[in-house]
Amino acid sequence: MASESGKLWGGRFVGTVDPIMEKFNSSITYDRHLWEADVQGSKAYSRGLEKAGLLTKAEMDQILHGLDKVAEEWAQGTFKLNPNDEDIHTANERRLKELIGETAGKLHTGRSRNDQVVTDLRLWMRQNCSMLSALLCELIRTMVDRAEAERDVLFPGYTHLQRAQPIRWSHWILSHAVALTRDSERLLEVRKRINVLPLGSGAIAGNPLGVDRELLRAELDFGAITLNSMDATSERDFVAEFLFWASLCMTHLSRMAEDLILYGTKEFSFVQLSDAYSTGSSLMPQKKNPDSLELIRSKAGRVFGRCAGLLMTLKGLPSTYNKDLQEDKEAVFEVSDTMSAVLQVATGVISTLQIHRENMGRALSPDMLATDLAYYLVRKGMPFRQAHEASGKAVFMAETKGVALNQLSLQELQTISPLFSGDVSHVWDYGHSVEQYEALGGTARSSVDWQIGQLRALLRAQQTESPPHASPK
């Protein structure tokens, strides 16, 4: 049990800890987020102790009742922290002793804060991953719904930020939705590796008192049990994986935000953000700034920093638990909060975005059909490399004459290749252009419909695979 100072350690120490060191060592300001998981883990462990004969039934019931009271105080906001509560485990155990007396001292039998904290963190992250998964799926669903509703809108596709080929607006939306679907799949995979029980590993060597880890696993609804006690208390792969997942997801969201910021400028005027997701200027009254998208873009860097910071912490550690690992929780909590906010804002932006179809259509230009002109010659039997060169000559001729590509006469085109004939006029139809890309994954209407169907099926499958995780007993 806690020493007279309220610490969970003591006996071999003399004197008091420097107040600056007290503050430096404390983590209660942020690991208090784990209060519910800490109570859940302690309740399961008390049942394990009772089964092992280390608690009587009456003692277990007393502890369980006390833990329920601790949880109630946290939930109602009445839990009072003590200056000596260096972390959530100290705080909860101290309060439990105040409520039920010395019996509380038996709860920590055979348990270390090393296996306790990593169990708490896994419980918290498992639940949080379910929440983030639901938010991410809602964003993808919103994007798919929008793509389905606006399938007939055409606009320029860009490579190197240069106009490339006509595509469907839906094709652009779906390109980002597909990337986010991979993020959704990765999150479920990360959660599976989070869902492994370390409790019962002790500080390093394991549990010598006959505690049934399979019972603990079932009580806390974990999918598996850790294989090695040294690894169980010190590995933070699951934290690094989560932070990397968030970094990659933010990469995708940042790229989408960058596209929309560009498309929303007066120079493009393809889209307009809702006032609900924009702000103004304190000096220039005409300004409508895409702050929602800019913050999504900037917060990507913040998340990357947390991921890199944790990896730098982990790479130099010797085996088993070290206090450095206290740094993992702040990173997890901050990134989780950031991801929750970003996903909700992104969903709001997409669902309320206004598109300017006319401007999108006006931005299409005949030079974007140069590739189609080459394909026209390919269909006439010309090898693609020759067709590419012939189309390039047509582009050069149009530029030299100061006219649009589709303004070249048939006679002028035939000076480049005799394969050009009257049906070349079909090349200059933007609708015809996009419809030729019928191969799966392309921008033709049939292919876009197929993509929408595939994404809806993936969302249904992921919803089945990732039901809301029930709280442990």
Swiss-Prot record:
* Gene for this chain: ASL
Which top-level enzyme class is recorded in the Swiss-Prot or TrEMBL entry? lyase
Chloroplast listed as a keyword:
no
What controls how active this protein is?
A: Enzyme activity is regulated by acetylation.
- Keywords annotated in UniProt: Acetylation, Amino-acid biosynthesis, Arginine biosynthesis, Lyase, Urea cycle
Report a single Gene Ontology molecular function.
argininosuccinate lyase activity
Q: What is this protein called?
A: Argininosuccinate lyase
* Stated role: Catalyzes the reversible cleavage of L-argininosuccinate to fumarate and L-arginine, an intermediate step reaction in the urea cycle mostly providing for hepatic nitrogen detoxification into excretable urea as well as de novo L-arginine synthesis in nonhepatic tissues. Essential regulator of intracellular and extracellular L-arginine pools.
Q: From the UniProt record, list the reaction(s) this protein catalyses.
A: 2-(N(omega)-L-arginino)succinate = fumarate + L-arginine
Q: Which Gene3D superfamilies match?
A: Fumarase/aspartase (C-terminal domain), Fumarase/aspartase (Central domain), Fumarase/aspartase (N-terminal domain)
Q: In which pathway does it act?
A: Amino-acid biosynthesis; L-arginine biosynthesis; L-arginine from L-ornithine and carbamoyl phosphate: step 3/3; Nitrogen metabolism; urea cycle; L-arginine and fumarate from (N(omega)-L-arginino)succinate: step 1/1
**Which species is listed as the source?**
Bos taurus
What EC number(s) does its UniProt record assign? 4.3.2.1
User: Do you know which InterPro entries this protein is assigned to?
Assistant: Arg_succ_lyase_C, Argininosuccinate_lyase, Fumarase/histidase_N, Fumarate_lyase_CS, Fumarate_lyase_fam, Fumarate_lyase_N, L-Aspartase-like
Q: Which residues bind 2-(N(omega)-L-arginino)succinate?
A: 27, 114, 159, 289, 321, 326, 329
